[in-house]
Amino acid sequence: MTFQPEIADIAKISFGVLSPEEILKMSCCKVTSVKVSDKGENIYSKFMGTIENGENCKTCDRDVWECPGHFGHFHLEVPVVNPIFINDACNILRCICFNCYKFIVSVDHLKLENLVRRFQDILLYVKNIKHCYNCESEKLPLSVVNEIIVDEDKNPLDTRKLLRVLENVDDETVRFLGFNPTMSHPKNFIFTVFPILPPCCRPYVMSEENCCDDDLTYQLIEIIKNNQYLGDEFLKKAELKRKKSLLQSSLPPTTDIKQKHLTNLWFRISTYFNNSKKKAKHAATAKPITGLKERIAGKEGQIRHNLLGKRCDQSGRTVVGPDPTLRLNELCVPKEMAEILTIPVHVTPFNRDALTQLVNSNKANFLIKAANPKRSINLKNVINYRGTLLYFGDIIERDGTRITITDTKFVLQPGDTIIRNGKALKEIRYPERKQIELEVGDVIKRQLMDGDYVLLNRQPTLHKASMMAFKVVIKPVKTLKINLAITKPFNCDFDGDEMNIHVPQSYEAIAELKELSCASKCIMSVQNGKPNVAIVQDSLIGLWFLSRDQWFCQTLKRSQFFNLLLTIDKAQNFLTRMDQICHVLKSKFPSKGNWEGSGLDGDGRVSPKVGRMVFNGRGLLSFLFPYDFDYCGGDGLSIESGVFLEGTLEKNVVNTLIKYIYKDYGETVVADFVDNIQFLTNHYLVDRGFTINASDCLKNESIAPEIVSLTRATFSKATTVRDVTINPFIQEQKTLAILNSCTDQCMKLSKECLSSDNNFCVTTESGSKGSIFNICQITSLLGQQTIDGKRVYGLLHPQDNEFQDRGFIANSFVEGLSPREFLHHAMAGRKGVIDTALLTSVSGYGQRQGVKLNEDIKIYPDYTVRDVNGRLYQYIFGEAGYDPSQTIVVDGHQTICNVYRLVNRLNRSYDSSALRPLTEDEIEWMVDFIQPRREYEYIPPDVEQRICSIRRDPIVGQLRRIQTVDALVPILKSHLEKCFYQTLMSPGECVGIIGAQSMGEFSTQATLNTFHVAGSTTTGAVTNCLTRFQEINNATKNPKNITCKVYFTKGNGTIEEIRRRGKDVKHIVFRDVVEKWTVEPATAEWWYATFKQLYAAPIAESGTVTKRVRFHLKRDIVFAYRISPQEIKQSLESKFDVSCIFSPFDEGLILDVFGKIEPHKLEAFVALMLPTYISGLEGIKAISYHKCDELKIWYIQTSGGTLSDFYTLDDIDVEHTTTNNIWDIYHTLGIEAAREFRIKELVEIIGTGVDLSHIKLRADRLTFTGTIQSLTRYTMRGEKPFSKVGFEEIMENFYKTARDAEVDDLTGVSASIMCGKRAKVGTSMFDIKLNLDAILCPPSTSPLLTTEDGTTSATTPIAATTPEQEDDEAFVDYDYT
C-alpha cells in the first residue's frame, strides 16, 4: 500500500468521540506485545510508522520525513470508562434507568428552552427523582471517586453493566440529553478498544548503553501489561499456580489479582491522559510522568508552543544598537548574518545570466534543481573545493616567505608548499572553483543583499508597530543597527536589547513588506494617530541650538554653513531657495537688513550682506521644510513658505510638525524631513560639541537658604494641618499634598537658579532627556517618598522630625543623602522595581485576553465590523470608519484633513481681494462624495444617513469659514475626495487585534516605566489605574472601591446646602454617634419628672427600674451631619421598649436610656442597640464634599451605595448622579448606559494614549449581546473551538468540544494558523481578479505601449473609474468569510 499525500486546505474539522468501530477502521495494526524482540506487532511496529533514517513505513511506504504516522490498537479485556468523560458518563447514567434503559422522567414534564444549558438543567431536575417513571424501578445513586464510578457504598460498578446500559439508550434520548448520537454517543465514553499513538508522537532516545522510552510509551507498556494480566489465559495460569503451591494461603486468590490489575489499569489509563497531579512516576527515578494533557496544554505545550508558535527558519537575532548615518527605513545587518540568511529566487529566461553570475561569485547558498525539487544542494560544498586541509601550526612557504597557520580556514594558492611537523607534504591539493550553470525552473537561495526588505521585531511584541520592515544595509559589524528616530514604537533603549529579523520567502511577502510594513510608510500610529517617528536625544539638542539662532546675525561661517547644507539630502535648488528666504524675510522684517542691490556676487555666489543675514541656524532649518509649508501655532513657532521665522524647536513641536507634514505631503516627504534633521544636527553637534559636566549640577549659592526656609515653612504648615484635622484619613491626605507642594516649588526654584545655557536645562527644555523633576532632585531636594501613594512608614521610636522620619528627603543628590534618607529612597525604589516585575505579567495577561477575544473581529467590504461567526459589533468602525493613523483633529472634531491649511496654501498664488466665501450649493457639491453608496444588508438607511452626517459635519464646518477663488473649488474638492478615501479604514483590517494591542501596549509600557519615577506619586497612580483598568475589562461585580457622585437639583449647590443633605446620604447607626457608655443606678434626678410632665414620656417607675444606660455621644459627628436628638430618640424608642432622655446640661451630649431590662442582660441589650439605624442610605460607609468645576456646584462623593437607593431621595439630580459600579448602572439604567460608562471610564484611565475608536469597539464587543460581558475565559465560551483552545483551559475545551460534537470551519485566525491555512484577514481576505483575455491575447494585440523611440513597454490596465462609478459586481468575487 502506497500513500500519496495531496497538499490541500482543510475545509472544516468535526470534533467527536471515536467509537470502537472507528478506532479499528483507523488502526493499521493490532499490538499484541510490548517487547520489541517478540513476534507479532509490538509497541514500535513498523506498520505505525518509522522513526529511524533509512527505514520505510510498512503502511504507506514513506520514509521518516514523509510518513505522518498511523495509529494502532489493542482490545481491552475489561471495558474502562474514558477518564476524560467519566463525569459526563456518570451524569448520563443518573438520568437513565438501569432496568428499562429509558429516561427516568417523562419528557413531557420538562420545559427546556436553553439548548446550551440543557444537560445542566436536566441534571438539576432529576437530582431528586427516586424512581423511574416507566418501570418504577429504584434509581441507583452514583458518584465518581478517584476516576471510578461507584455506588452509594463506594463500591466500583461493573463497567460491563455500565456499557450495556449506554448501548441500549436510544438515539432520541441521546439527542434530548444534548448529545450527537453519531459523533458523540455516550456509549463511546467507555473504552473497549484502546488506540495507540504512532511512534513519531513518542520517539525513543538512543544512547550508547541503552534505549530510553518516551513517557507515553512507558505508560502504554504498563497499560498493555495490566490488560494482559486481566486476560483469561493469565488468570487461569495464576489459579493453576495457586493450586499447585504447597502454601496456598500465602498466594492471593484470583479475584484479588484481577482487582489489583484492574485498579492499575484504571490508574494507568487515567494518568496516560492527565498526570497533572503527578501521581504516576517512573519506578527507577520517581520522576513524574508526562501525560497527554501536559504535552498539549500550557505555555510550553504543543498548541501554544508549536501550532501557535512564531519560531521559524530564515530569521536572526542579535543585539541592536543605534546608527545615526542610516535613513529612517534602513537597517544595518551584520555581514556574517547576511551570508547565512537567504531569499529564494526562481530562475527565468530573463534573470538566468544574472543569477548564474551571482551563484558563481559565492552570493548564493543553496540550489534546488527543477528535476529534483526535494533535494537542496549546498553550493558552498560544490563551488569551493578547499583543497588540502590545514592544521594549526602548519607552515606555508609562499614566494620565499613563511606563514604560520593560526586559522585552519586559510586558503592555499597554487605554488604553496606545506610544511607539517618539519617535513614538506608530497601531495598537495590546491583549491578549485567549479562553475555552476543554471537552468530555467531552478530555484536558488541567494544571500541577503543591500536593498532587500526584512521584518524587524523586538519582543515583547505589544502592538502592530513592534514589527516593521526595513531596507537592508550590510556592514562588517556584529550587531543590528537602526535609526534612532524609529526606536519609539519598539521601545528599545540600546542597553543590551536584542531584536529579531525575519527574511520574506515569497514575492508576495516582499511586496507586503515594501508597501505596507515599511517603516517609512508607518509614520503615524494606528494606536492614537500620533507619530511613530520621533526626533530624540542628540538631534533634539541640535535642533534646539539651531532654532535659537536669530536672523540677521551670522552665527556660522560661510564654509561651515555650506558644509552643513551639504548634509541635507534632496535639498531644493540653492539659489531659488535663497531668493525665497530673502523674499520672505524682506516682507516680514522690512526694517531689518540691507535689502538694496543684488543678493549675489558677480560670479553667482551669495553676497556677504546676505550671508550676514542668513548664515545661521534658522537659515539652515529653512532648507528642511517644503517650499510651501506654513505653520503658526500656539507654541510660538512661525514658519512661512518653508522659512523658519521664529520660535524654538523642542520635542512636542517637532512631533506636531511631523504630523502636519505627513498630512500635507505624504510619507516620503516626512521620511526625508526626519532623515535630513538627523544628518544636519549630527554634523552640527560634531562641530559645536555638547557635554554635561559637574559644573552643571552646581546651583546658585543664594538659592540654598530659600530652599531651607521653604522646607521649614512646609513642615510648619503640615504640623498645623495635622493638629486641626480630626479625621486621620483626611489628615494624611492634606499632609501629603502640602509636602508634595514643597517639591513643586523647589522645582521652580531649581529652574530659576540655573542659567539657560546650563546643559541640564538644555536637555530638559529641548525634550532630549529628563525633566525639571530630575534637575530638582540633583540640585535642590528629593522631596517626599511615597509607596502606593502613601508616605513611607517611620521607625518605631520617636524622631526629632516626624516628616523626615516618614520619608521626606530634604537633601539633593549633589549634597548627598543621610542614612535615613538613603533607606527611604531605597524603599521607594524597591517598590518601583517590584511593580515593574509583578504588574507587567498582569498587564501582559490582560493584553492577551483582549487579543484572543477580539482576534476574529475585522472590517468587511461593506465597512461593517463583524467576526467570523457573523456577529455584528458596529455598523462602521468608530462611528465614522476612519483610520486613526490618517485622521487629524480640527476644531475639536476628528476629520480627514485640515481645510484651513489646505486653502491657505492654495490661496498663496492669488490676490487676497479676489477671495470670497463658498456658497451653500458649492459646499454641498464639494462633499457629495460622502453619501450612502449601496444599501448593505447590515446597515439600516437611517444609520447610514447618521454615518454620513458624522463624516460631513466637520468638513462642512470648515468649508463655511474659508475664502477662496473660483478656480480652486474643483481642486479643493478633488483633494478632499482623495483624503476621504485615504482616511477610510481598509476592509480586511483586524481592528479587534489592533484595538486590543493598542490598549494592552499602553498599560504594559506604563507599568514598565514606573521605576523611572520611583518614590513619586506617579507610581501609585499607575498601579491604581491598572487595577481599575482590570475591573472595567473584567466587569468585576464587587469593585475594590465603590464610589458614587450624588447631585441635587434644588438650590444653588453651595457647600452649606450639600452638608445639610449629608445625613440623608451617609448610613449612620447608633454606634457611629456613641463615644462611650456606662451603666448607672436609676436615681430619680429632678429633670426626669419634668421631662415626664412635659412630654408624657413612658418612664418606668423607680421601683421597677434599678439601672439606666448612659450614652456619651460624639459631638462632632452629631453636629457634622445635623442629627437632632429627637431623631436618635425616635429611632431607639421605635425599635426597643425603652425611654430616652437627653441631659439638659452643657457637660456634653448625654443620653439616658431606661427600660425594663434585667441587670445581667444589660450588656447584651446595649450590643443590640448599637446597630440601630439613625439616618442615611444603607451601604454608604463615608461621604466627602467636592466641587464640580464644570457645573460649578458642589456634590457628595460616597463610599458605597447604589443608584436605586439614591433615586429614592428627594430632589436628586438623576442626570448627573453616577457610580463607578458598572453592574449597578446596568441593573438600574440598562445596557446602553453601561456601554457609555465603560467608554467614559476607559477614556479617563487611558486618556489620549489610545484612539476613541478602539475604546468604543472594546465597549461594543463586551455589551453587544445585551448583557455585560467580561474579558475572561467565560466570554470565550461562545467562540469557535480552536479560538477557545488557543486561549485557556486547552484540554477542557477539547473535551467539551468533542462531547458536544462541535464543528470548526477554520475561518478564525487561531484555527487558520493551527491548520497551516492563510487567515482571511488583511490582504489574504481578497483574491486577485485577473483579466485572462488580456493576458492570453496574441502578441499582435498584446497590451504593450509603443513609445516615441519605437520601444515597447508593458503596462497594467487601470480602470479609469471613480468610486461612484463602481458597479455592484465589484464585490461579487470577494470572500466575505
UniProtKB/Swiss-Prot annotation:
Extract one GO molecular function annotation from the record: DNA-directed RNA polymerase activity
Q: Which residues bind Zn(2+) 1?
A: 57, 60, 67, 70
Question: In Gene Ontology terms, what is a biological process of this protein?
Answer: DNA-templated transcription
User: One GO CC term of this entry?
Assistant: DNA-directed RNA polymerase complex
| The EC number(s) this enzyme carries | 2.7.7.6
- Key word Magnesium present in the record? yes
Going by the UniProt record, its keywords in alphabetical order are: DNA-directed RNA polymerase, Magnesium, Metal-binding, Nucleotidyltransferase, Transcription, Transferase, Zinc
Regions of compositional bias (Acidic residues) in chain numbering = 1364-1377
**Which residues of the sequence carry a binding annotation for Mg(2+)?**
493, 495, 497
Record-listed Zn(2+) 2 binding positions:
97, 100, 132
- Record keyword Nucleotidyltransferase present: yes
Bilayer-spanning residue ranges: none
Q: What reaction is this protein's catalytic activity?
A: RNA(n) + a ribonucleoside 5'-triphosphate = RNA(n+1) + diphosphate
The domain of life is Viruses
Against Pfam families, the record matches this protein to: RNA_pol_Rpb1_1, RNA_pol_Rpb1_2, RNA_pol_Rpb1_3, RNA_pol_Rpb1_4, RNA_pol_Rpb1_5
Start and end residues of each stretch annotated as Disordered:
1343-1377
- Cross-referenced SMART domains, in alphabetical order? RPOLA_N
Ranges annotated as biased composition (Low complexity): 1351-1363
State the family it belongs to. Belongs to the RNA polymerase beta' chain family.
| Protein function | Component of the DNA-dependent RNA polymerase that catalyzes the transcription of DNA into RNA using the four ribonucleoside triphosphates as substrates. Largest and catalytic component of RNA polymerase II which synthesizes mRNA precursors and many functional non-coding RNAs. Forms the polymerase active center together with the second largest subunit.
Q: What is this protein called?
A: Probable DNA-directed RNA polymerase II subunit RPB1 homolog
Species, as recorded: Invertebrate iridescent virus 3
